[in-house]
């Protein structure tokens, strides 16, 4: 594992795809980092596009404890929305910012091992790091991998993986520093104020109180898992906030620090 955190793993949520200005700003930030020799790996979701595509095909979106339920008949549509449309929208924004990128999925390069997470969720996967050679080769060229959260089991079955968990596995694989970027500035308390730092006990208390729930619960628990595994803080921050992106480019702490 790298000890100098030379790879910055940026996980972006699906809401970014609906904000051209946000995408442009984030890609400009990434371009500046790459120009300074900072290796950047981007992992993305695309929930809003998935919802749109399912609705267009007369299918319903169902979630269980913040995770998307993926029946087999929905898998081709979900894979198309995430590994196809969402990935290429982000790659287009990267190209516009002058970034050389590689669009990929978790299924590429023997990068992760995937299995069914929970039968109740259908074709939802859980991934563990496997082989970092493919990613490390791309990063060594100064290119930016843009990875969707579609994985594949050994039998060729596609799986839909929560993008926060996907980013966690890839951060472990490359020994990188993980930043979970969404449309909120970090974890908020019951009064809507930013919490600058959280540890495992504080997270458990806030989950019990219902302050951290649904998608943010999944996000924070993924961040805590990788923070504990790597022995360093994981950041939960916003792509909407220009000042946070500038600070991020300088290597400063932004948003909420999830402590190991």
From Swiss-Prot:
Belongs to the acetylglutamate kinase family. ArgB subfamily. It is found in: Cytoplasm. GO terms for cellular component: cytoplasm. Pathway: Amino-acid biosynthesis; L-arginine biosynthesis; N(2)-acetyl-L-ornithine from L-glutamate: step 2/4. Catalyzes the ATP-dependent phosphorylation of N-acetyl-L-glutamate. InterPro entries: AceGlu_kinase-like_sf, AcgluKinase_fam, ArgB, Asp/Glu/Uridylate_kinase. GO terms for biological process: arginine biosynthetic process via ornithine; L-arginine biosynthetic process. The gene is argB. Keywords: Amino-acid biosynthesis, Arginine biosynthesis, ATP-binding, Cytoplasm, Kinase, Nucleotide-binding, Transferase. Its EC number is 2.7.2.8. It catalyses: N-acetyl-L-glutamate + ATP = N-acetyl-L-glutamyl 5-phosphate + ADP. PANTHER family: N-ACETYLGLUTAMATE SYNTHASE, N-ACETYLGLUTAMATE SYNTHASE, MITOCHONDRIAL. The record marks 11, 219 as: Transition state stabilizer. The keyword Kinase applies. It is an enzyme of class 2 (transferase). NCBIfam families: argB. This is Acetylglutamate kinase. It comes from Shewanella baltica (strain OS155 / ATCC BAA-1091). Substrate binds at residues 46-47, 68, 160.
